[in-house]
UniProtKB/Swiss-Prot annotation:
HAMAP family registered for this protein in UniProt: ATP_synth_alpha_bact (MF_01346)
Region named Unknown: 550-799
Signal sequence, renumbered to the chain: none
Gene: atpA
Subunit-level organization: F-type ATPases have 2 components, CF(1) - the catalytic core - and CF(0) - the membrane proton channel. CF(1) has five subunits: alpha(3), beta(3), gamma(1), delta(1), epsilon(1). CF(0) has three main subunits: a(1), b(2) and c(9-12). The alpha and beta chains form an alternating ring which encloses part of the gamma chain. CF(1) is attached to CF(0) by a central stalk formed by the gamma and epsilon chains, while a peripheral stalk is formed by the delta and b chains.
Name this polypeptide is given: ATP synthase subunit alpha
GO MF terms, alphabetically ordered: ADP binding; ATP binding; proton-transporting ATP synthase activity, rotational mechanism
Length: 799
């Protein structure tokens, strides 16, 4: 029995000896010589690679960045509080790599690709090293597709193509990040993945960016890589390489990617910090000699691949922060020479309220024009020239008042162009809309619109063309040709006339233009228009008593001939308001709960017109003047007018001093359900005179501010923006446009019905702000001294 056991044991030993391999597992180990400021000197790692990950005894990792003869300089990628001299350091024989693929979409990660958004760990099937050689010359294709930013001035003057590197440069607080975020938001639905790399930013700033992207649904196709200001310099150094590595994976899959580096100035500072701590010799501005190579190898990885490699692209928007507008500093000049153009943000323009504050003179796009669609290229080509002429003459015009007509024309056009390219954040345009807006500049039509109304006119113009065959033709052709150009010229002239409600100054279209215009609109085109204006005469001036409950939402569907213009609708409303009735075809009125037809047989009884519905007990009684004519200047509905107390004018010097010398600032928490707020509104100088000098107590606005409101600060918009006074708010009354005018016209700061209708053109409701006591400042205050954010339709909420 014992012999059998021994025999079995010997057999097992022999079997193990046969399987023995002579290969030995080698483990390279070094020791910590010194450490400090996130840098560790290690000896004993003679075969370590550049950018290789090394691991310390406590599990913290570092990256070998300096390979010297007697030691290795390692930058730490984690907490080094527990590392001490003499600790062992192990090679891992792998380069820094991060997870890539669609699993990264919608995530916020650190410089090592680890999730920091509290949405769980990232489970990736593929990893990629962060340092790669950029695609070669023969692997690339020229830029030929536009990347739409949705920002009018950029798409028109400095277009960006897919695969381009376009620098955004300027001082702090000039709107650089806003442009980049708007560009990301505008990629929604365009099959473009986005990467936003935040380098050295505050955590609160990054959180705001993420919230803004989430609010616009942009995080669905975006990855945010963050190395905030409190992170180790090594993490700030590798963050942009992590971002472009994530982007490259999608590019090689044939997808288009937009990457934003915010910003490379802080990236260069982080690299300078590491280099000085590693005892590398400093150069200009203490930057190491290879700082140019640092950014060139990063930005060269953005490109457009040729079709054989999938035709994917990476478009890079690096951001550089300048000091006092100095673009000749070391890092700005380096990055300008690497990129394919720059967008220069100007502090003076930003402070003057020009947003985006782009300096057209110093900005340029060297390759993007090849990617512009033809319609934008046709209309945007003259934009830079018009602005250059305006800038040149603007300086000279300040030295004298005697200007010739040509100079006045150029200055007027230039001011209009500056207003045209103003654009609020997160309000992108598609390129067809941009082409239509730019057409008004190219054809010199925009100066007809007052500068202060151009922002409203742009929205009006786009709504004017919305859903028309003319716009569809432009979107299909992507160009202005001999057929649609005269039609657009005629249509825009009609739109301007309609917007200004000024038919006596209307410039009729030439015969050829009118013919081209008519070609795009035929008699069979049915347009559904909003019925609020058309049926004001029913709602306000006539007794309409249905037997069953009806909805307030009423629409009219009618056959119209040619192109239905808002001006024509407005004129129809005026006729109806003034009791001018003619024989009309039966119209179908569509209500939410009821449907009825106005009876075809209309009876006239003792000077009254009766319209009866046979299915419902509706009766509409309207007095008709025997002559058939009524004064067009004013409505005769005196019954609706209410008596509003005259506003009390405050004369007490002490009270005025107290009111005038308070400091107001905008507050995110200013609008609450409990605390009463102060709002700021803008009115014309004439309206301000009526309010403060003549004690008119009603100010009209298009929208209602958030409640509750106690005080209202007032600033005038011309000739200069000045805060001229304030008033205590009695109440806010909301009615339809006609009702508000009929009720408050005698107390209104707006003196004429024509001016009132111009202001409320295309709006359903008027909001009357009633003042109880007014306080006129003796020294008007500069609007720029108020720290504020713009609210809806001129409202600013203050504390």
């Amino acid at each position: 029995m014992t012999d059998n056991k021994n025999h079995s044991l010997i057999s097992d030993i022999k079997s193990q000896i046969k399987k023995f391999s002579e290969k030995a597992l080698t483990l390279e180990v070094g020791n910590v010589i010194s450490l400090g400021d996130g840098i560790v000197l290690v000896d004993g790692l003679d075969n370590v690679m550049l950018n290789e990950i090394v691991r310390f005894e406590n599990g913290v990792e570092g990256m070998a960045l300096n390979l010297e003869e007697d030691a290795v300089g390692v930058v730490l990628l984690g907490d080094y509080s527990n590392i001490k001299e003499g600790d062992r350091v192990y090679r891992t024989k792998r380069i820094v790599e991060v997870p890539v693929g669609d699993v990264m979409l919608g995530r916020v990660v650190d410089a090592l690709g680890k999730a920091v958004d509290n949405k769980g760990n990232i489970v990736a099937n593929k990893f990629s090293v962060i340092e790669k050689i950029a695609p070669g010359v023969m692997d690339r294709k020229s830029v030929h597709q536009p990347l739409e930013t949705g920002i009018l001035s950029i798409d028109a003057m400095f277009p960006i193509g897919k695969g381009q590197r376009e620098l955004i440069i300027g001082d702090r607080q000039t709107g650089k990040t806003t442009i980049a975020i708007d560009a990301i938001i505008n990629q929604k639905g365009r099959n473009v993945n986005c990467v936003y790399v935040a380098i050295g930013q505050k955590n609160s700033t990054i959180a705001n960016v993420v919230r803004e992207l989430e609010a616009h649904g942009a995080m669905e196709y975006t990855t945010v890589v963050t190395a905030n200001a409190s992170e180790l310099p090594a993490l700030q150094y590798i963050a942009p390489f992590t971002g472009v590595t994530i982007a490259e994976e999608w590019m090689h899959q044939g997808k288009d990617v937009l990457i934003v580096y915010d910003d490379l100035s802080k990236h260069a500072i982080a690299y300078r910090t590491l280099s000085l701590l590693l005892r590398r010799p400093p150069g200009r501005e203490a930057y190491p000699g290879d700082v140019f190579y640092l950014h060139s190898r990063l930005l060269e990885r953005a490109c457009k691949l040729k079709d054989e490699l999938g035709a994917g692209s990476i478009t890079a928007l690096p951001i550089i922060e300048t000091q006092a507008g100095d673009i000749s500093a070391y890092i700005p000049t380096n990055v300008i020479s690497i990129t394919d153009g720059q967008i220069f943000m100007m502090t003076s323009l930003f402070n003057a309220g020009q947003r985006p504050a782009i300096d057209a003179g110093q900005s340029v796009s060297r390759v993007g024009s090849a990617a512009q669609i033809k319609s934008v290229k046709q209309t945007g080509a003259s934009l830079k020239l018009e602005l250059a002429n305006y800038r040149e003459l603007e300086a000279f015009s300040q030295f004298g008042s005697d200007l010739d007509d040509e100079t006045k024309r150029i200055l007027k056009l230039g001011k209009a162009v500056m207003a045209v390219i103003k654009q609020a954040p997160n309000k992108p345009y598609n390129q067809t809309d941009e082409a239509i807006i730019l057409f008004t500049v190219k054809e010199k039509l925009i100066p007809q619109v007052p500068v202060e109304r151009i922002q409203d006119f742009k929205e009006y113009l786009l709504n004017y063309f919305k859903g028309t065959k003319l716009r569809a033709d432009l979107e299909d052709k992507k160009a202005f040709d001999k057929e649609n150009t005269p039609a657009f010229r005629c249509a825009i002239q009609k739109a301007i006339n309609s917007f200004l409600n000024n038919s006596q100054d209307f410039k009729p279209c030439e015969e050829a233009e009118q013919t081209a215009f008519d070609k795009f609109f035929n008699e069979n085109e049915s347009i559904v228009v909003d019925g609020e204006n058309d049926f004001n005469f029913i709602n306000e001036e006539v007794s309409l008593k249905p037997t069953t409950e009806t909805s307030e939402a009423v629409q009219i569907e009618e056959k119209v001939q040619d192109f239905v213009e808002p001006q024509e609708i407005l004129e129809t409303n005026k006729m109806e308001e003034n009791h001018i009735f003619e024989e009309v075809e039966p119209e179908k009125i569509i209500c939410e709960h009821h449907e009825f037809e106005i009876a075809e047989n209309q009876e006239k009884i003792e000077g009254q017109q009766v319209l009866e519905d046979t299915n419902h007990e509706y009766s509409i009684y309207e007095t008709v003047e025997q002559s058939g004519e009524v004064d067009n200047d004013e409505s005769k509905d005196d019954d609706l007018e209410v008596l509003v107390p005259v506003a009390e004018i405050e004369h007490d010097e002490a009270i005025l001093d107290e009111r005038e010398n308070r400091n107001w600032v905008f507050s995110d928490s200013a609008v609450s359900e409990v605390e009463k707020q102060t709002i700021m509104i803008s009115i014309s100088s004439n309206e301000a005179e009526q309010l403060f000098d003549n004690a008119k107590s009603v100010v009209f606005f298009k929208v209602t501010p958030k409640y509750p409101v106690e005080k209202v600060l007032v600033y005038v918009t011309s000739p200069v923006q000045k805060v001229v006074g304030e008033f205590d708010l009695l109440k806010i009354d909301v009615n339809s446009v006609n009702t508000s005018w009929n009720k408050y016209r005698s107390s209104s700061v707006i003196s004429s019905r024509k001016e009132y209708l111009e202001y409320f053109n295309s709006h359903k409701e008027a909001h009357a702000l009633l003042a109880s006591k007014v306080y006129k400042y003796r020294k008007p205050k500069d609007l720029a001294s108020f720290n504020m954010n713009k609210g809806p339709s001129g409202f600013t909420y203050l504390k």
